[in-house]
């Protein structure tokens, strides 16, 4: 395991909402929710910290957000402007290193082991980047500094907003032991529920389990979690990373025969895929359905649409059609997955925040 790298994860604080509050003084100090009209279909893209105090969070239906925060200010947002500001932030990053891996408009990994300013301390680089972003753009960012991407990303969320958390190789295992396992990469709702049933709530709980036992209970997730909780991750910062597909899949706790359960899963996946596509500023043209039967036979079916889309309803309709064509209801399903491929950048003026 290479512990000599100096990795920073920068995560802008409530990015879209912060840009709006910066540009519109009337929004400052008020619960601002980006996601469109709460009386129509849509979900929250992001919200200000004032709105978060009421329990509002991203991916929540706007109608639910309105109930939690009746005095909230709802706006559609301006994606083209957020892209412009994101590019300004990346220009600041490039003053320090060319090894930059953007994850979305509002976050990125930076490898500053060999940085352009010859600074020996990654912590000082992170602080200077935070200060520069605030001074030049009037926005705050949180930073995590460590020797690998996994720990740096967790650390950036530790002292939000505008905080910085440094985790050295010597501190890594103790730091990870206190972290809820729901914060670990790859732990979604289904895996979190399995971990909860196993009595695993924190990194410390996770560390008590052997590698074999975790793999037996969680399969490939167990393999990765065993390494992550020990700070073992050698993934490099990849400036050429380009997502070729966006998808979601789940392995059911019990094999499923009911097509309605499968349809419900696809609907949830479509919403999640839509959210990720919009964050990546992409849309796709090919929908892929994956089914794994109880005997571990796996099939994939794909449908190429007439036009590119990032709309959950269109993605779901295509997936549901593939399900009808593929599933007879005679054999139970162990795993179901939905992926959108054939991606290309979205024309920003056509991005629909309201129908996220």
Swiss-Prot record:
Active-site residues, record numbering mapped to chain: 107
Catalytic activity, EC: 2.7.7.7
Gene Ontology MF terms in the entry: damaged DNA binding; DNA-directed DNA polymerase activity; magnesium ion binding
Catalyzed chemical reaction(s): DNA(n) + a 2'-deoxyribonucleoside 5'-triphosphate = DNA(n+1) + diphosphate
One GO-annotated biological process of the protein: DNA-templated DNA replication
Residues at which Mg(2+) binds: 11, 106
Cofactor: Mg(2+)
Enzyme class at the top of the EC tree: transferase
Keywords from the UniProt entry: Cytoplasm, DNA damage, DNA repair, DNA replication, DNA-binding, DNA-directed DNA polymerase, Magnesium, Metal-binding, Mutator protein, Nucleotidyltransferase, Transferase
CDD domains: PolY_Pol_IV_kappa
Keyword Nucleotidyltransferase belongs to the record: yes
Pfam family, one: IMS_C
Similarity comment: family membership: Belongs to the DNA polymerase type-Y family.
Oligomeric form and interacting partners: Monomer.
Protein name: DNA polymerase IV
Taxonomic source organism: Listeria monocytogenes serovar 1/2a (strain ATCC BAA-679 / EGD-e)
